[in-house]
């Protein structure tokens, strides 16, 4: 089973690409949480497990991570873009 780890920094509008943001600014949101990311992952159609003690390598404070399971047929970048699209809908 393939697992991808997704961090809140990937979607954070306050971060630059070099600081870890992986989506364009028009899809990025302010201070995303692992709960919002997990909801978006489920909307995309994958299983999500929240790991709150995880820390992204470019951050000092732990904000958690979401482990996405069952992504054998999807590239990580495509997955991140799909999650970002749903995060915008969740925030509205």
Swiss-Prot record:
Gene Ontology CC entries for this record: signal recognition particle
Family as reported in the entry's similarity comment: Belongs to the SRP19 family.
Protein name: Signal recognition particle 19 kDa protein
A biological process from GO: SRP-dependent cotranslational protein targeting to membrane, signal sequence recognition
Places the protein is found: Cytoplasm
Domain of life: Archaea
Keywords noted in UniProt: Cytoplasm, Ribonucleoprotein, RNA-binding, Signal recognition particle
InterPro entries reported in the protein's UniProt record: Signal_recog_particle_SRP19 (IPR002778), SRP19 (IPR053394), SRP19-like_sf (IPR036521), SRP19_arc-type (IPR022938)
Entry-linked Gene3D superfamilies: Signal recognition particle, SRP19-like subunit (3.30.56.30)
PANTHER family cross-referenced by the UniProt entry: SIGNAL RECOGNITION PARTICLE 19 KD PROTEIN (PTHR17453), SIGNAL RECOGNITION PARTICLE 19 KDA PROTEIN (PTHR17453:SF0)
NCBIfam families: Sig_rec_Srp19_Halo
Protein function: Involved in targeting and insertion of nascent membrane proteins into the cytoplasmic membrane. Binds directly to 7S RNA and mediates binding of the 54 kDa subunit of the SRP.
Subunit structure as annotated in this protein's UniProt entry: Part of the signal recognition particle protein translocation system, which is composed of SRP and FtsY. Archaeal SRP consists of a 7S RNA molecule of 300 nucleotides and two protein subunits: SRP54 and SRP19.
The keyword Cytoplasm appears for this protein: yes
Pfam families the UniProt entry points to: SRP19
GO molecular function, one term: 7S RNA binding
KW RNA-binding (keyword) present: yes
């Amino acid at each position: 089973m393939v697992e991808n780890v997704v961090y809140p920094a990937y979607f954070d509008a306050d971060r630059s690409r070099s600081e870890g943001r992986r989506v364009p600014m028009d899809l990025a949101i302010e201070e995303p949480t692992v709960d919002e990311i997990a909801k978006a992952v489920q909307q995309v159609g994958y299983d999500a497990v929240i790991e709150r003690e995880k820390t992204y390598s470019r951050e000092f404070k732990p904000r958690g991570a979401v482990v996405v399971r069952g992504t054998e047929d999807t590239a990580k970048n495509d997955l991140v873009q799909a999650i970002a699209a749903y995060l915008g809908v969740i925030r509205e």
